[in-house]
Amino acid sequence: MAMLTCPTRGPHQKVVSFTFYHDARVKNEKQKNFSAGISGNLTLVRRLYGAGWTMRLYYDLDPGPAGQLQLRQLCELACADPQLDLCRVRRLPGRPLEDASEVYPLLWRFLPTLDPQVSVFLSRDLDSRITAREVAAVAEWLGSPGGEAVHCMRDHPEHTKPIMGGMWGARSDTGGPGEYYL
C-alpha cells in the first residue's frame, strides 16, 4: 500500500521528520490530535517551507482494523501530496537499520540522520504545528556563513532541556567529520 519514496528522491534531501504510531496507553483524543497533526503539518511544510522540502512520516500501526483504516488514510494523503513520504519502520530501505520497530517510537523521527541522501533534517512533533517564526529561524540557520551542523530551538520558558526532541535539526553540508551521514 504505502510506498517508501525517499530513496528515489536522490541526494540533498531536505526533510521535516515526524513519528506516528499507535500507543494503547494514549487516550483516543490524544491519538486524534496526532492524526490531525499529519495533514495539518503537511499543509504547513508545503506552504511555509516550500517545494524543496519533504515531510517524512515514520510509522508503525496496529495490524487490526483501526490500524488498517489509518494506513489507508495515510496512503490517500501520500497519493494526494508528493511532499509526503511514508516510511514504515519495519521495512526501511537498508543499512544501517532495516527494521526500527524495536527502537523507542519517539526516536524514529531521528532516522533521517542515518540516510546519506539527506542533507538537512528537522525533527518535529505531530501535536504541534510548524510556525512562520520557526521557518524564519531555520532559514537563518541554513543561511548563516559557516553554518552550524546542529540547530536547536526553545520557544517557551519551560523549554529548559539542551535539545528538545521535536525542535532541532541537523545538516551534513558543513564539512565536519560527520559530513556524509548526519
What spans do the regions from the language model cover?
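Exposed alpha-helical structural elements
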Residues: 70-73, 176-180
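Generic detection of intrinsically disordered/low-complexity segments and helix-coil linkers/edges
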Residues: 12, 28, 102-104, 162
